[in-house]
Amino acid sequence: MIDQWDGSCYRRTLVIRERPLEVSVRQLPGPASPVLGVELRGSSATLADEDVAEARRVLELTLGLGVDLGGFYRLADGDERLRNLARRFSGMRPPCFPTVFEAVVNAIACQQLSLAVGIHLLNRLAEHHAPTRSGGGWPPAFPTPERLAETDPQDLRELGFSRAKSHAVILLARQVATGEVDLEALRDEPDDRALATLVALSGVGRWSAEYTLLRGLGRHHVLPGDDVGAQNNLRRLFGLDQGAGYDAVADLAQAWWPYGGLVYFHLLLDALATAGDVIIAAFAAAESPSVASEVAGGVRRTAS
């Protein structure tokens, strides 16, 4: 699996400066304010300071460590249903994919599929097309654009991708690898321009584009209005009319501005917990955890 969690340790292999870097993250015991201990492992004898700095940046992005939840909790206090949801998952931070490319590929892969099937498909993609093989049981890194650009569509078909999705993923990989499309530049673009760029890509419609704004660009005000799962959850918890679609979801999201995306994540967690796919433990305090460990620089470094 790309992301691994054993109940106390989160593990993932990141591609940092074109090299795999294996990351493990734990919440350290002791202080009242949450502190995360991070261990990095690379293939070279030493890790450069630039590697550590980039790994820190990516972890802060992917784990949502810089997100201030105070405004969301104040909003939730004004609505009993939202308040109960927020309290149930107090301290939950919005995750983000390490790269916009990974977010778009996730969106394409998960179109018209259940979350479980989509995740299975993406894990198979990583297992067969990771840019490098990690040792010691570490997770496979998500494939780079350069790696997927060299892949034949039939290879993805054999993993379970549809013909259209296979072509869309490989075309996107080639566009990014050659510089024809710069997805990371979308981080500096306003929503409307980012959406226009995304929907112009093969295989990307409104849902995929809005999903990418939320999961790839960290636009936490965006609630993907075409998301069928979100619509079902809104009906279950907020009384959204049966048959109500994008416009009705957009109206609700406007009332929650600028936290529609945070509501989306809480609804997803609630649905997973209700289905027994997530075990609710003692969630972290609402304040931001800091990235630290026992050594100077905030990260323990090892070489494999």
Predicted segments — roles?
Residues 1-304:
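HhH-family (HhH-GPD) DNA N-glycosylase catalytic core used in base-excision repair
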